[in-house]
Design a protein with these regions (language model features):
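TRNA-recognition modules of translation machinery and tRNA-sensing kinases, especially anticodon-binding
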Residues: 1-134
């Protein structure tokens, strides 16, 4: 019995390969994420609709502390931008040289009604390039 890779898996692999050829590193990050990385570090206001229960899967009874020692909740990530923040932090901590060029593919989750064009879990790929002449 043989199997085949899912078309989405093939598409993400090909996109990652193309951007790798252009000098981008493919990065991965947690699907269960603190609201700090998912919202706060990206300047998403506390009252933004994306934070509502009807848009985001919040994890009940799971709390942690952010880097400022403030209590934060946890969510299933709503985008792959959390990987951008984590990678930029790593670059600063490790005093790495810029430019920073990353490809961030991954599953994301939205608490919404499913139909022919909407699903609670889907894939997203985003790129980030940071440099002096970017």
């Amino acid at each position: 019995m043989t199997g085949h890779a899912h078309p989405m898996t093939l598409a993400i692999a090909r996109i990652s390969e193309i951007f790798s050829d252009l000098g981008f590193d493919t990065v991965d990050g947690p699907e269960l994420e603190s609201e700090w990385y998912n919202f706060d570090a990206l300047n998403v206001p506390k009252d933004h609709p994306a934070r509502d229960m009807q848009d985001t899967f919040w994890i009940k009874d799971r709390k942690g502390l952010n880097k400022f020692n403030e209590e934060v909740g946890y969510v299933l990530r709503t985008h792959t931008s959390n990987m951008q923040i984590r990678t930029m932090e790593k670059y600063v901590q490790e005093k790495r040289e810029f430019p920073l060029a990353i490809c961030c593919p991954g599953k994301v989750f939205r608490n919404e009604a499913t139909d022919a064009t909407h699903e609670a879990q889907f894939h997203q790929v985003e790129m980030l390039y940071v440099g002096k002449d970017a």
